[in-house]
């Protein structure tokens, strides 16, 4: 028996989902150009994804099953590394569909076939919770247009909407190679180059919408019980919408962004979850006296904006980095938000 109840398809347009009271419609927008990412020269050291061959070598023997290692079944270049993301998101998509009855479409800014899909009303019209995942390397030049920013702003005027922004890490922003090496030694992932800067699209969207947050660094969480992330420091008094109810920790990932708040007004955005950092590995951020980084943030509705804005990294929604009851509780909170 196959794990999927229906056969997979490719190369067709999305069928709009009807509004169903009490059952949210979630959509995912991956803000990369797949051809730009997959077409990066593997001879370049920085600002590219790993090839599948590199993944297999570093994580050996995790991907030595022919399902992953046979070049007749799975791409071995950078494209293969990209496809792992889609595999990792499937359990979250299935969880949402089982909970809401609605499928979760995954849009790409530019997909494998070269089709360009802007974040416009076609994507937003049948969506209640919109995930925008900033996995685009800055070097590929993805920027939100003024029309896209206006479309998202209009989306957020609708009652009950939620925009979930997830710019990924920004490793090696310094021009000082010694600092880049310190950052690399801190996270310890051989698959991440000394410079890997993500999220140009989400940064431009964030700026256009006036969200006072910037993704910085790639920080390694403190751990307990092997590779389980240390519990979050949660501001439950500020979490009036119960985003983190029943949540103690997120899944472990070696390099996560610090969502730096760029306003002094404490009422604009709430830092609900902070992640303790592995202090055994030096990093400029910890050397400045920081012991935690901002992991989950919430902007409550304000003014003409009737919808919520949350900040959460893409890894929280990927099974590649593990799924436990705490993470499922978080997923359920996102799906059932009122």
What does each model-found stretch correspond to?
Residues 1-338:
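Short, surface-exposed patches at the edges or C-terminal ends of soluble domains, predominantly
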């Amino acid at each position: 028996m196959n794990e999927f109840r229906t056969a997979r398809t490719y190369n067709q347009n999305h069928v709009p989902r009807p509004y169903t009271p009490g059952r949210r419609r979630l959509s995912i927008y991956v803000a990369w150009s797949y051809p730009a990412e997959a077409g990066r020269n593997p001879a370049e050291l920085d600002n590219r994804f790993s090839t599948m061959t590199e993944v297999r070598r570093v994580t050996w023997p995790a991907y030595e099953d022919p399902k992953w290692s046979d070049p007749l079944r799975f791409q071995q270049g950078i494209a293969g590394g990209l496809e792992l993301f889609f595999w990792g998101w499937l359990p979250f998509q299935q969880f949402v569909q089982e909970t809401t009855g609605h499928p979760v479409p995954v849009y790409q800014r530019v997909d494998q076939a070269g089709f360009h899909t802007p974040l416009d009303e076609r994507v937003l019209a049948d969506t209640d919770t919109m995930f925008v995942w900033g996995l685009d390397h800055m070097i590929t030049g993805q920027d939100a247009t003024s029309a896209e920013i206006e479309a998202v702003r209009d989306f957020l005027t609708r009652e009950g909407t939620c925009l979930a922004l997830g710019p990924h890490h920004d490793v090696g922003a310094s021009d000082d190679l010694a600092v880049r090496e310190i950052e690399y030694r801190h996270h310890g992932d051989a698959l991440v180059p000394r410079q890997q800067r993500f999220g140009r699209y989400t940064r431009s969207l964030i700026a256009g919408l006036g969200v006072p947050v910037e993704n910085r660094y790639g920080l390694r969480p403190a751990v307990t019980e092997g590779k389980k992330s240390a519990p979050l420091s949660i501001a439950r008094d500020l979490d009036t919408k119960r985003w983190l109810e029943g949540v103690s920790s997120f899944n472990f990932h070696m390099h996560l962004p610090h969502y730096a708040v760029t306003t002094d007004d404490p009422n604009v955005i709430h830092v609900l979850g902070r992640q303790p950092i592995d202090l055994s590995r030096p990093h400029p951020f910890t050397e400045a006296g920081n012991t935690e980084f901002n992991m989950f943030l919430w902007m409550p509705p304000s003014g003409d904006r009737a919808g919520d804005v949350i900040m959460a990294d893409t890894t929280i929604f990927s099974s590649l980095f593990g799924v436990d009851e705490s993470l499922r509780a978080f997923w359920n909170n996102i799906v059932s938000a009122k």
